[in-house]
UniProtKB/Swiss-Prot annotation:
Claim: Transmembrane helix is one of the keywords in the record: yes
Source organism (scientific name): Syncerus caffer
Entry-linked SUPFAM superfamilies: a domain/subunit of cytochrome bc1 complex (Ubiquinol-cytochrome c reductase) (SSF81648), Transmembrane di-heme cytochromes (SSF81342)
Role summary: Component of the ubiquinol-cytochrome c reductase complex (complex III or cytochrome b-c1 complex) that is part of the mitochondrial respiratory chain. The b-c1 complex mediates electron transfer from ubiquinol to cytochrome c. Contributes to the generation of a proton gradient across the mitochondrial membrane that is then used for ATP synthesis.
Name by which UniProt lists this protein: Cytochrome b
Organism placement in taxonomy: Eukaryota, Metazoa, Chordata, Craniata, Vertebrata
Keyword Electron transport: yes
Length: 379
């Protein structure tokens, strides 16, 4: 008799995705981040749901409702900080996941990769709108600055910004709609993640060597279920250390001041996970140019498969490309640091150089290094 997990219509889907799935025998811990992102998403949806039960999306009460959650709701403080820091963990996992994809050439799975890029944009949009909800100073001014970027679009820009605001400034209408979008988007992300997984399971996972692993597969369960559980425990440990010991480490003190349209904070900056893109935006002295650079800094991921000139898929056996990859990582860390600094010398020039370096590495240096490595193989 066939086991129920192989015959039941629903169980069969789960079985083929998480139990009897043939997986490469050599995938490293860099392949853990997919499941960790799933855990982050579930955690964010659950904590967000409980926060939404007590939050009010009105400009007059939003700030005090968050204070009420922290001060009066049973365990409200831990739910709030798990949600805020959960977003940081989400982005750490996200950047590691994308970095893994770049290093090991996973972007050759086109559908999986493209849906992944769409997911990245959606998560970034969700996080941005979530940051506006507590209605502190940085919430308000962050929303004002970022939405205002759309006014750089020729002809329709100003109308577009006012349409998004629902008025002539960031106000009640903006906060209400941001809350509505922030609530719905995670469910869209969950649906996209399932499609992401569906396309991945069409091809099977990549592995560190980049060579086909069809001849050497092992079942996902128990080997990778136990590995994912270890990853999950480490993720939760890191999150809870952050939440319980330094919950405000990654936040901005300005957000503990209620939003005031008449008083601009000295340094407007987004959360840490957007600083690299913010630095690229600021490094161009033209508004439209900056906005384009900002969008392209992430949209560039879409063309990664076109920039792959190597005869090998993975960077495992390509020392030149490895070197450039880690320079790119260092460059992104530099941009993250610059994004949090004031706009003054020497930060301006460092930001501009790091921005040029970012695009130069991806568009020119890495494809060139790959071609050189191809020629070295002939020797």
């Amino acid at each position: 008799m066939t086991h129920i997990r192989k015959s039941h219509p629903l169980m069969k889907i789960l079985n083929n995705a998480f139990i009897d799935l043939p997986a490469p025998s050599n995938i490293s811990s860099w392949w853990n981040f997919g499941s960790l992102l799933g855990i982050c998403l579930i955690l964010q949806i659950l904590t967000g749901l409980f926060l939404a039960m007590h939050y009010t999306s009105d400009t007059t009460t939003a700030f005090s409702s968050v204070a009420h959650i922290c001060x009066d709701v049973n365990y409200g403080w831990i739910i709030r900080y798990m949600h805020a820091n959960g977003a940081s963990m989400f982005f750490i996992c996200l950047y590691m996941h994308v970095g893994r994809g770049l290093y090991y050439g996973s972007y050759t799975f086109l559908e999986t990769w493209n849906i992944g890029v769409i997911l990245l944009f959606t998560v970034m949009a969700t996080a941005f709108m979530g940051y506006v909800l507590p209605w502190g100073q940085m919430s308000f001014w962050g929303a004002t600055v970022i939405t205002n970027l759309l006014s750089a679009i020729p002809y329709i820009g100003t109308n577009l910004v006012e349409w998004i605001w629902g008025g002539f400034s960031v106000d009640k209408a903006t906060l209400t709609r941001f809350f509505a979008f922030h609530f719905i988007l995670p469910f869209i992300i969950a649906a996209l993640a399932m499609i992401h997984l569906l396309f991945l399971h069409e091809t099977g996972s990549n592995n560190p060597t980049g060579i086909s692993s069809d001849t050497d597969k092992i079942p996902f369960h128990p080997y990778y279920t136990i590995k994912d559980i270890l990853g999950a425990l480490l993720l939760i440990l890191a999150l809870m250390l952050l939440v319980l010991f330094s919950p405000d480490l990654l936040g901005d003190p300005d957000n503990y001041t209620p939003a005031n349209p008449l008083n601009t904070p000295p340094h407007i900056k987004p959360e840490w996970y957007f600083l690299f893109a913010y630095a690229i935006l600021r490094s161009i002295p033209n508004k439209l140019g900056g906005v384009l650079a900002l969008i392209l800094s992430i949209l560039i991921l879409i063309i990664m498969p076109l920039l792959h000139t190597s005869k090998q898929r993975s960077m495992m056996f390509r020392p030149l490309s490895q070197c450039l990859f880690w320079i790119l990582v260092a460059d992104l860390l530099t941009l993250t640091w610059i994004g949090g600094q004031p706009v003054e010398h020497p930060y301006i020039i460092i930001g501009q150089l790091a921005s040029i370096m970012y695009f130069l590495l991806i568009l020119v240096l890495m494809p060139t290094a790959s071609t050189i490595e191809n020629n070295l193989l002939k020797w």
